């Protein structure tokens, strides 16, 4: 799925989580006017005016104003979730997807969960307890991985663009399926055929190869 585990993690833990904390730790007025919310609205070209005029008065002194601010805060929250949440998640994903060190740590944590899964509960997904079935990688994912990894083997650095050699490209799991890995887009890396076949079934070899722009 193009909606990767990392996308979901960003939305639920980094985006919705921050929003939830802001709501429960502040009054409606403080929540609406907090720098965090205003900065996010401005980042994506919005202002609070898109949901209406700011209420007047001070909610801590008047229950009527408190209800007005609460209603306005709910509108801000709703607009945020419908229009900003997904955009922000994509921005964060764009940065994290290029960081192999982060992806390795992320997939290592995911593997801890996968290892506890039982085939009896997920017969269509698991090969056996704690091991996900292998899946073919769609063309869109292969293109994305090649673009991110700059057409180079992520273990030896060999060029796999076909310009300088004819080495066969392979798409490899950073955290192997046999060790709790998944077929998720964020767990796939580009390798040459030699390096891929040289790895053991449980090998977690990877390198965070950084190719400078100049």
Report each predicted region and the residues it spans.
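Short, charged surface segments at domain edges that flank catalytic/cofactor-binding sites
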Residues: 110-158
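Histidine-centered nuclease catalytic patch
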Residues: 158-190, 205, 210-211
């Amino acid at each position: 799925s193009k909606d990767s585990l990392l996308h979901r993690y960003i939305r639920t833990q980094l985006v919705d989580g921050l929003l939830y904390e802001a709501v429960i730790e502040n009054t409606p007025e403080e929540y609406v006017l907090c720098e965090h919310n205003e900065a996010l609205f401005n980042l994506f070209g919005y202002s609070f005016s898109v949901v209406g005029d700011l209420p007047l008065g001070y909610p801590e002194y008047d229950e009527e104003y408190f209800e007005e601010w609460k209603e306005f805060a709910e509108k801000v929250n709703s607009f945020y979730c419908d229009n900003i949440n997904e955009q922000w998640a994509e921005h964060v994903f764009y940065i994290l997807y290029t960081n192999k060190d982060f992806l390795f740590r992320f997939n290592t944590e995911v593997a801890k969960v996968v290892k506890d899964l039982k085939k009896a509960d997920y017969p269509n997904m698991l090969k056996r307890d704690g091991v996900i079935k292998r899946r073919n990688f769609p063309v869109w994912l292969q293109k994305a991985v090649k673009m991110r990894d700059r057409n180079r083997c992520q273990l030896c650095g060999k060029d796999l663009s076909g310009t300088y050699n004819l080495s066969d490209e392979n798409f490899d799991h950073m955290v192997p399926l046999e060790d709790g890995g998944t077929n998720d887009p964020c767990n796939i890396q580009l390798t040459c055929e030699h390096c891929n076949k040289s790895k053991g079934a449980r090998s977690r070899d990877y390198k965070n190869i950084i190719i400078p722009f100049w």
